[in-house]
Amino acid sequence: IEDYIEHVPLSNYHDYEKYINRMANGEKNILVSEDVEYFGHTSGTTGKQKLIPATKSGRIAASKYMAILSQRFVYNNFKENFKYGKGLMFADTVTTTYTKSGIPICSATSGGMKKIKGLIPYMYTSPYEVMEVKDKEAQMYLHLLFALNERKLSYITSVFISNVLDLLRFLEEKID
């Protein structure tokens, strides 16, 4: 392990930031050879939001494995009570802005969700159109409405736990 660490040192976002900024400005063949489809932004809970370049092949791999892994995680941990039901995936597909060169910037999951929209009805309670709603409160209401109608609701998930907490607080607030 020490040899590996010596030859491949650990890095962090700061080490790549100037390259990512160049990519955001439209420069190609930096860090990746494919075109950047979109930049996912982090939640910013640990500081300034970071941009993560997403390519077609990276998005396909991430979407495929995230969907499979999340379903498998739920099954492995709740198999005695698993009902093979859908889950409430609190996510959106709203593009928040664009880079100077016109590349979309959205939450890290938005770009991937757009590309798997055909699978969404089989895995999640909310239709894809709910994920397109820009008003966060309206979107939370709709996600909850569809989830509460699902008799075999198996799980509630989101990429960011803070979104699940917001959703549950919203439910408590509006329960009456």
For each predicted feature, which ranges?
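Active-site phosphate/ATP/adenylate-binding loop shared across adenylate-forming ligases
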Residues: 2-176
